[in-house]
Amino acid sequence: MTAPRPAVRLVVLDMAGTTVADGGLVEQAFGAATATLGLEAGSAEHARMLDHVRATMGESKISVFRHLFGDEDTAQQANLAFEAAYHDLIDGGSCAPLPGAEQAIGALRDGGLKVVLTTGFSRATQDRILDALGWQDIADLTLCPADAGRGRPYPDMVLTALLRTATDDVRQIAVCGDTGYDMLTGVRAGASVVAGVLTGAHDEARLRTDGATEVLASVAELPGLLLQEER
């Protein structure tokens, strides 16, 4: 007889597009970054790169730039320009929580689950977002790719969250995000719940193709899914 799956004890949440409204900020910052490198908006090359950015939403941004430019110095230059542009957008008031996100995180923690916020951004950008939202203490832990080794779609951040929170079993993990790479990360980490949300980059078909076990309208529905196990 197969043993029942243990109840979820750890929730690993994405930020932009899942708990934080993106509103096209990534694409705006990408446009600013490529402009510094002389890439003309509207050109065929710019369109090709933007398609790749959209397809790989959730991936570590420096990894995206390495793929696009194939040269470390150029990738680092683009990444610095991207971060500067993104920080300007945050400082200009373009950063806001998605409806119900704060309440969902609070409900999950009140229900005894540990919550970890993860991102494909650098630590500097992640902290900028957290500071802008007043979210420094909203979660048990926050992680970026540099904290774990590799970013999405690799399982490193999820497994680092498991280790840092002393969670016993990968089956006690729920991963929630808005991109296919979030789903792949959850699957590769062995999470029992891999929940996609429709508030960000990718549609239900992409989320399910990449391994979603559930697709929710938004993160606001996540406590209802996970906390019913505790009843």
Residue ranges and their predicted role:
Residues 4-106:
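N-terminal helical cap/lid subdomain that shapes the substrate entry/recognition surface
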Residues 30, 101-133, 143:
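Substrate-recognition element of Asp-dependent hydrolases with the DxDx(T/V) motif
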Residues 45-48, 137-141, 169-173, 193:
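Short acidic capping loops at alpha-helix termini that bridge into adjacent secondary structure
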Residues 52-54, 135-151, 172:
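A short, structured active-site edge motif that brings together acidic residues
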Residues 102-110, 162-163, 183-188:
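Surface-exposed amphipathic alpha-helices with a cationic face
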Residues 134-144, 206-224:
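Structural recognition of alpha->loop->beta junctions
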Residues 152-183:
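Conserved Lys-Pro-Asp/Glu-containing loop-to-beta segment of HAD-superfamily phosphomonoesterases
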Residues 174-214:
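Acidic, Mg2+-coordinating phosphoryl-transfer loop and its flanking beta/alpha structural elements
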